[in-house]
From Swiss-Prot:
Biological processes per GO annotation: cellular response to lipoprotein particle stimulus; cholesterol efflux; cholesterol homeostasis; cholesterol metabolic process; diacylglycerol catabolic process; high-density lipoprotein particle assembly; high-density lipoprotein particle clearance; high-density lipoprotein particle remodeling
Organism ancestry: Eukaryota, Metazoa, Chordata, Craniata, Vertebrata
Involvement in disorder: Defects in Apoa2 are the cause of senescence accelerated mouse (SAM), the senile amyloid is a mutated apolipoprotein A-II.
Name recorded for this polypeptide: Apolipoprotein A-II
The UniProt record lists the keyword Iron-sulfur: no
Major place of residence: secreted
Alphabetic keyword roster: Amyloid, Cleavage on pair of basic residues, Disease variant, HDL, Lipid transport, Oxidation, Secreted, Signal, Transport
Gene label: Apoa2
Family matches, as PANTHER family: APOLIPOPROTEIN A-II (PTHR11027:SF0)
Subunit structure: Monomer. Interacts with NAXE and NDRG1.
Length: 102
């Protein structure tokens, strides 16, 4: 029985000592992690700015606006015509006298 208690005590001490060593081990340095993170974000921002300066993005934006303009112009004109016709019909209704009730 004493032998079993001694073995259990020895196993417990060894496991606690191992946990203590793990806690004392140097973990990743937080400052270096932040430095790496900010450096990668800076590099990404620089790459993005270089891509934005290229004429490819500008030409794509110009093509998009031209296409949108071509598609919206007829729609706006037809909406304007419909609005004028609607107001004209309202004006014609107001000009007609209502029949008198008998």
């Amino acid at each position: 029985m004493k032998l079993l208690a001694m073995v259990a005590l020895l196993v417990t001490i060894c496991s606690l000592e191992g946990a203590l060593v793990k806690r004392q081990a140097d973990g990743p340095d937080m400052q270096s992690l932040f430095t790496q993170y900010f450096q990668s974000m800076t590099d990404y921002g620089k790459d993005l700015m270089e891509k934005a300066k290229t004429s490819e993005i500008q030409s794509q934006a110009k093509a998009y606006f031209e296409k949108t303009h071509e598609q919206l112009t007829p729609l706006v004109r037809s909406a304007g015509t419909s609005l004028v016709n609607f107001f004209s019909s309202l004006m014609n209704l107001e000009e007609k006298p209502a029949p008198a009730a008998k």
